[in-house]
Amino acid sequence: MIYISEFIGRHVEVIQSSNRYDVGISGQVSFETKNTFEITKGTGKVIVPKEGRIFTFDGKFKVDGSLINYRPEDRLREYRKILKKLGGN
């Protein structure tokens, strides 16, 4: 399940956002906090909030940023909450 995976090192693109200027930002995730991704693109870095955005990872996995709004080390512990929000068991 991509929602509990490690995102650092993956290619990411913002495909939907409450801020229209964020749509289309893409690059490699170089750092992650509870609320943000640091995306390396070209020669610069951009910090993008997770909340209110939908991302694609590696060009195939669509992820709602609101559901991964946890510290990376806490996502596995919060697996049941994430699954419930996704409509699973």
Curated annotation (Swiss-Prot):
- Which interval of the chain is the signal sequence? none
| Top-rank EC class of the record's enzyme | hydrolase
Q: Where in the cell is it found?
A: Cytoplasm
> Do you know which Pfam families this protein is assigned to?
RNase_P-MRP_p29 (PF01868)
This entry's Gene Ontology molecular function terms read: ribonuclease P activity; RNA binding
Which InterPro entries does the record cross-reference, listed alphabetically?
Answer: RNase_P/MRP_Rpp29_sf (IPR036980), RNP1 (IPR023538), Rof/RNase_P-like (IPR023534), Rpp29/RNP1 (IPR002730)
Superkingdom to which the source organism belongs: Archaea
Provide the E.C. number(s) assigned to this enzyme.
Answer: 3.1.26.5
GO cellular component: a single term: ribonuclease P complex
Specify whether tRNA processing is a keyword of the entry: yes
Q: Which UniProt keywords apply?
A: Cytoplasm, Endonuclease, Hydrolase, Nuclease, tRNA processing
Name the reaction it catalyses.
Endonucleolytic cleavage of RNA, removing 5'-extranucleotides from tRNA precursor
Q: What is its main location?
A: cytoplasm
What are its GO biological-process terms?
A: tRNA 5'-leader removal
Assembly and interaction partners: Consists of a catalytic RNA component and at least 4-5 protein subunits.
Q: Which HAMAP family match?
A: RNase_P_1 (MF_00754)
The family classification in the record reads:
Belongs to the eukaryotic/archaeal RNase P protein component 1 family.
Job description of the protein: Part of ribonuclease P, a protein complex that generates mature tRNA molecules by cleaving their 5'-ends.
Q: What is this protein called?
A: Ribonuclease P protein component 1
